[in-house]
Amino acid sequence: MRQLLPGDTAWRNIRLATMDPQQQTPYGLVDNLALIVREGLICDIVPKTQIPVSGDNIHDMQGRLVTPGLIDCHTHLVFAGSRAGEWEQRLNGVSYQYISAQGGGINATVSATRACAEDTLYLLAHERMMRLINEGVTLLEIKSGYGLELATEEKMLRVAAKLAAENAIDISSTLLAAHATPVEYHGDPDGYIALVCETIIPQLWKKRLFEAVDLFCESVGFSVAHSERVLQTAKALGIPVKGHVEQLSLLGGAQLVSRYQGLSADHIEYLDEAGVAAMRDGGTVGVLLPGAFYFLGETQRPPVELLRRYQVPVAVASDFNPGTSPFCSLHLAMNMACVQFGLTPEEAWAGVTRHAARALGRQATHGQLRAGFRADFVVWDAEQPVEIVYEPGRNPLYQRVYQGQIT
């Protein structure tokens, strides 16, 4: 019988989906186990017979399924305003160009976010974050990008920091100042990129308000040349990078980000084989965002077979944002990734655990249930992991554990 030390906590009689690729079973499934937590970390995983049936700090889960805490590695959940009205306009035949000319589109979100008080912005983001927490998310990425000026980009990142400080969740903050050209720089993307590179990135990095720099390399975003200047600026400061690339066209953004050893290349619907090879060589994770694909009515699917062939890790994320993916549900994103992009349920699970952790640079501590990893996990009223993917409208979450504490 295993002797627990003072302060240890054990979850026994569990079916563990470790998501450890070294396990030879689907999902890394092992039955009849006990998981021992010490000081917020997984101390050991042992047969359930080594742990007493009951006692202080012993939780008998009666054979329930346990998985790593979910990781949503791409969100834009700090914003103000709603774009529901313009979505209805588009469905009624009004062009996006007309809506944008009337102050709609991303500019509407930028205006609303700039005008929103920081406390109000926090409350809006907190409600959205709680929806993900209630699905079992324990690590969440949040991007800025609706400020497009120093003050509001900083305000958004402060909100993300406060969410992390005051709630039982890890947050990885990303600076996305190179999201779009703001109206005050209309026709002058060079001037705006200069502001991003010479002012916004270095000043906010000094305050350590973010962990990585992101950009939108696209025909309706920034050119390859502009994107490379952002990447050069970040790399000169030792900041990890990532990119929204190949969403609407093939510009070579994935190759560019991979040359800078980017953490991830996100969207990638128009990714070609050269881009896939570059991602493999750069150690860059491909992040699939099926919510945006669905909401925009796109038809070009990411090259999943190529990604498999080149053994590029594939993550899945909600991309929650007001303009192109108003779906604050990682369960739904997993289902969409299977139905629309052809992932297997096991690949979808890897995409919201170990591969999502890698996309955030957290692969040594998050995304798997192994000794030494963070004790962030979810207990489900389910027998198989596929159930969570199969029926996204039903949430069988039984217990969420963050740093070894039931939340």
Swiss-Prot record:
The keyword Transmembrane does not apply. Its cofactor is Zn(2+); Fe(3+). Its EC number is 3.5.2.7. GO terms for biological process: L-histidine catabolic process to glutamate and formamide; L-histidine catabolic process to glutamate and formate. Pfam families: Amidohydro_1. GO terms for molecular function: imidazolonepropionase activity; iron ion binding; zinc ion binding. 4-imidazolone-5-propanoate binds at residues 83, 146, 179, 247, 324. Binds 1 zinc or iron ion per subunit. Keywords: Cytoplasm, Histidine metabolism, Hydrolase, Iron, Metal-binding, Zinc. N-formimidoyl-L-glutamate binds at residues 146, 321, 323. Gene3D superfamilies: Metal-dependent hydrolases (3.20.20.140), Urease, subunit C, domain 1 (2.30.40.10). It comes from the Bacteria. One of its GO terms (cellular component) is cytoplasm. It catalyses: 4-imidazolone-5-propanoate + H2O = N-formimidoyl-L-glutamate. Catalyzes the hydrolytic cleavage of the carbon-nitrogen bond in imidazolone-5-propanoate to yield N-formimidoyl-L-glutamate. It is the third step in the universal histidine degradation pathway. Belongs to the metallo-dependent hydrolases superfamily. HutI family. This is Imidazolonepropionase. It comes from Salmonella arizonae (strain ATCC BAA-731 / CDC346-86 / RSK2980). The gene is hutI.
